[in-house]
Curated annotation (Swiss-Prot):
Top-level taxon of the source organism: Eukaryota
Region Disordered, residue ranges: 518-542
Ranges that cross the membrane: 10-30, 124-144, 151-171, 177-197, 213-233, 237-257, 328-348, 355-375, 390-410, 412-432, 472-492
Protein known as: Organic anion transporter 3
Cellular component terms (Gene Ontology): basolateral plasma membrane
Catalytic activity: estrone 3-sulfate(out) + glutarate(in) = estrone 3-sulfate(in) + glutarate(out); estrone 3-sulfate(in) + 2-oxoglutarate(out) = estrone 3-sulfate(out) + 2-oxoglutarate(in); glutarate(in) + 2-oxoglutarate(out) = glutarate(out) + 2-oxoglutarate(in); urate(in) + 2-oxoglutarate(out) = urate(out) + 2-oxoglutarate(in)
Keywords: Cell membrane, Detoxification, Glycoprotein, Ion transport, Lipid transport, Membrane, Phosphoprotein, Transmembrane, Transmembrane helix, Transport
Length: 542
């Protein structure tokens, strides 16, 4: 008897599973708010130097650039007891008295003057948030294996609520960055535990549906954020609004049961059996639950217990040529996806369109993108879908270099298309990665791959700083990396309709067999090629 059969006996998709998925899905709505929050809390409005004391703003104070616009970071020098310069050729100086912002929104940029020479700090704040997600993935995965999925999930809800709320009261930028790091750290634990607890409590045939449903919760969260930001123009209140609900989620998480597999592997089989019986009662199958025994439960997870005893490390991902190829190609694809995705997702204000409307469009494109990805995965295969998604995204980003800034509609269309392709790339990678790595090292492979996505998302904001050298440099970097990631994906083996490999040897045999099957039709075609024989009265046929 397998664990899936035990799950069928207690109700594989009953009221419990619907409640379970709902409890896991609702907090994901708020994760989109935190991931993309700096789009609105760190908006840079138009600004110019504050005039010196006893002087009013005007062309005699503020120089004009080549485009006829007021300089944002310079003003004319005013010598004591001298007349003000009346042309743009006078000596200039930085904004010594601060800036005037043409906006009613209150952001971290306007509060701490993150403009001109300090504009790099804005991108650094987002990178530090992404660094928190990266470190959280490295640390919390191990803690989850030691202490269980549910305690980590509950603690991360509390940490996100506390650190997010504390961010709203940050007196200085460094303290703001520390709390944002903790927000990212906790988000990583929420993502990890949500994925595992969803997969382990629903039947195999329903996993794709429930995973997609939880994924769409993130998409819906992207619709909610612009509405909240529009209604709450003060960044501190907006930060507090998206953080406080996690105090409630931490209380609701007590209704989420622990992973049965983890309980059995941790030697807590009796507790696992009690939980299964409660689930059976909730699903209206109390009698079936009472019939379950510890022996049946342990027997159903015997394979998991055996695999848990085997010791595998990150080094095993590079043990064989096939695993090395898979690990390196997937790492590049994950890095490219995270790197390019956040270049577009966090660059909403660069396209000259209302940021609230554009964010809704950016969120909305995920719906058709994920649907098209599912169809492509089912009919065209994994490596074609993955390669095409990244290559098309890279082409769209590179195309932005050749579109003038005043053609905002065309630039927006290209950005939305690229963002949709990258959303599809993420959806494909989660499935593709889990299918490529053998069972004995799948969790390690998924973890390393996810780390590369986080590294990409952490570096992505910093690349925008290169735009100070030449405006087109960031898009060249983003687009080229996406093209490289897509090209790497084309070197991965196809997994469509293939059984999942259990061991490293299974993976080697499977790859060699698939390679052999590809060569057989080619050999057969070659054998069927009959050379043309000359014919005619003067031909010797002996």
């Amino acid at each position: 008897m397998t664990f899936s059969e035990i799950l069928d006996r207690v109700g594989s998709m009953g009221p419990f599973q619907f409640l379970h998925v709902a409890l896991l899905g609702f907090p994901i709505l708020g994760m989109a708010n935190h991931n993309l929050l700096q789009i609105f809390t760190a908006t840079t409005p138009s600004h110019h130097c504050r005039p010196p004391p006893n002087a009013s703003a005007g062309p005699w104070v503020l120089p004009v650039n080549q485009n006829g616009q007021t300089e944002r970071c310079l003003r004319f020098v005013h010598p004591p007891n001298a007349s003000l310069p009346n042309d743009t050729q006078g000596a200039t100086e930085p904004c010594l008295d601060g800036w005037v912002y043409n906006s009613t929104r209150d952001t971290i940029v306007t509060e701490w003057d993150l403009v001109c020479s300090s504009n790099k700090l804005k991108e650094m704040a987002q990178s530090i948030f992404m660094a928190g997600i990266l470190i959280g993935g490295l640390v919390l995965g191990d803690l989850s294996d030691r202490f269980g999925r549910k305690p980590i999930l509950t603690c991360c809800y509390l940490l996100l609520a506390a650190s997010g709320s504390s961010t709203a009261f940050s007196p200085t930028l460094p303290i703001y960055m520390v709390f944002r790091f903790l927000c990212g750290f906790s988000i990583s634990g929420i993502s990890l535990s949500t994925v595992i607890l969803n997969v382990e409590w629903v039947p195999t045939k329903m996993r794709a549906i429930t995973s997609t449903a939880i994924g769409y919760c993130y998409t819906i969260g992207q619709f909610i954020l612009p509405g909240l930001a529009y209604a709450i123009p003060q960044w501190r209140w907006l930060q507090l609004t998206v953080s406080v609900p996690y105090f409630i989620f931490s209380l609701l998480s007590w209704w989420i049961p622990e992973s049965i597999r983890w309980l059995v592997l941790a030697g807590k089989s009796s507790k696992a059996l009690k939980i299964l019986r409660r689930v059976a009662t909730f699903n209206g199958k109390k009698e079936e639950g009472e019939k379950l025994s510890l022996e049946e439960l342990k027997l159903s997870l015997q394979k998991d217990i055996s695999l848990a005893k085997a010791k595998y490390s990150t080094a095993d991902l590079f043990r064989t040529p096939i695993l090395r190829r898979v690990t390196l190609c997937l790492s590049l694809a994950w890095f490219a996806t995270g790197f390019a995705y956040y270049s577009l997702a966090m660059g909403v204000e660069e396209f000259g369109v209302n940021i609230y409307i554009l964010q809704i469009i950016f969120g909305g494109v995920d719906i058709p993108a994920k649907f098209i990805t599912i169809l492509s995965l089912s009919y065209l295969g994994r490596h074609i879908t993955q390669g095409a998604a990244l290559i098309l995204a890279g082409a769209a980003i590179l195309s932005l270099i050749f579109v003038p800034m005043d053609m905002s509609l065309l630039r927006t269309i290209l950005a939305v298309f690229g963002k949709g392709c990258l959303s599809g790339s993420f959806s494909c990678l989660f499935l593709y990665t889990s299918e490529l790595f053998p069972t004995v090292i799948r969790q390690t492979g998924m973890g390393i791959s996810n780390v590369w996505a986080r590294v990409g998302s952490m570096i992505s904001p910093l690349v925008k700083i290169t735009g100070e050298i030449q405006p087109f440099i960031p898009n060249i970097i983003y687009g080229t990396v996406a093209l490289l990631g897509g090209s790497a994906a084309l070197f991965l083996p196809e997994t469509l309709n293939q059984p999942l490999p259990e061991t490293l040897e299974d993976m080697e045999n499977w790859f060699l067999q698939s390679k052999k099957l590809k060569q057989e039709p080619e050999a057969e075609k070659a054998s069927q090629r009959i050379p043309l024989q000359p014919s005619g009265p003067g031909v010797d046929r002996s």
